[in-house]
Regions:
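Alpha-helical transmembrane segments in inner-membrane proteins
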Residues: 1-319
Length: 319
């Protein structure tokens, strides 16, 4: 099992390197230095986003013990869209476009983190609070934020409506260098901090009762891991925009491909698959569709179809 898992990680690493090299070198124009620099920045953003979404989804699915749910159910994606739309609604699109990139990144990340912490604080005041109650509240807030966003989009100037709509699509083509390094630093710090809990993931995957019986301080560990999920989701969303179905797609492909219960194998594999997926789809957007579509549309279409497939497959098992 260990030898097979090592071989699979090596194969995924090689595929990731090949896909990164292909993205960097494919169809370079005459002014290749400028194009190479832009592509390198996009690749760094892809690596940050892919790793952050993979780790956040892996932690979240381990905690809730469900392979269909993703961190987007907490409503953070909807809150991100609400923040950006509210700025356009209150101050105009020119204010949003002229804002300091780092200030906007910190504002979005800070508000998403503040929302998560307040939510966790009130929901986990009581011991033994059911995690699924948190998911229910997250769905309610996500719907509420989405409704507010739609309400403001209806009222704003039609010329600014398109800008508000563009915010909802993830993009790796307008990455700010300063934000990139801030996001990278946060990602590295979060991954390093999470390493001390990787050994707990295998136990948490067995369920709450088994985890408690095996000596895990469940409530404390749950709070810390959910905070890590909020940090990773906030950073990736504030950096490039929402990618709703990426985590769902990557996690299920990882489990089907690796078939190993150990999270020290699953997490690196999920990160590599996430990066490969984003690179290949960015290649499609750039060179096949020539920017006539967006990365979000491709990810959400494929992820949505796969989500329906998972539901149908689960329904067959229950029949």
């Amino acid at each position: 099992m260990a030898k097979k898992s090592s071989s699979q990680l090596i194969v995924l690493s090689l595929l990731a390197i090949v896909s990164l090299a292909l993205y960097l070198g494919y169809n370079l124009p005459n002014r290749w230095q400028y194009a190479l620099e832009n592509r390198a920045l996009s690749l760094i953003a892809i690596v940050i986003t892919g790793a952050a979404i993979a780790l956040a989804t892996m932690i979240f699915q381990t905690v809730v013990n469900n392979r269909i749910l993703t961190p987007s159910i907490l409503g953070l994606d909807s809150l991100y869209l609400l923040i950006q739309t509210a700025i356009i609604f209150l101050f105009g699109s020119s204010t949003l476009l002229s804002m300091n990139s780092i200030a906007l990144f910190v504002l979005c990340t800070g508000l998403m983190m503040a929302f998560s912490l307040v939510l966790y604080h009130f929901l986990f005041k009581k011991e033994n609070q059911n995690i699924f109650f948190l998911l229910l509240v997250g769905i309610i807030f996500g719907t509420f934020f989405g409704s507010l966003t739609t309400f403001m989009e209806v009222l704003i100037d039609p010329n600014e409506f398109q800008i508000a709509q563009d915010i909802g699509f993830a993009s790796f083509n307008r990455i700010n260098t300063q934000i990139l390094w801030v996001a990278l630093a946060i990602l590295v710090a979060t991954i390093v901090f999470s390493l001390r809990y990787w050994h707990c993931f295998d136990v948490l995957a067995l369920g709450r009762e088994n985890a408690v019986n095996l000596g895990i301080d469940y409530q404390k560990t749950l709070k810390i891991l959910l905070i890590l999920v909020a940090i990773l989701t906030s950073v990736s969303t504030a950096l490039v925009g929402p990618l709703t179905f990426l985590g769902l797609l990557v996690m299920n492909v990882t489990v089907e491909f690796v078939r190993d219960y150990r999270h020290k194998v699953l997490i690196p594999a999920a990160m590599l698959i996430s990066i490969i997926t984003l690179v290949l789809r960015q290649l499609l957007v750039t060179h096949i569709f020539t920017f006539r579509t967006t990365l979000s549309i491709i990810v959400n279409f494929v992820g949505g179809v796969y989500f329906i497939y998972l539901l149908l497959r689960a329904n067959k098992k229950w029949q």
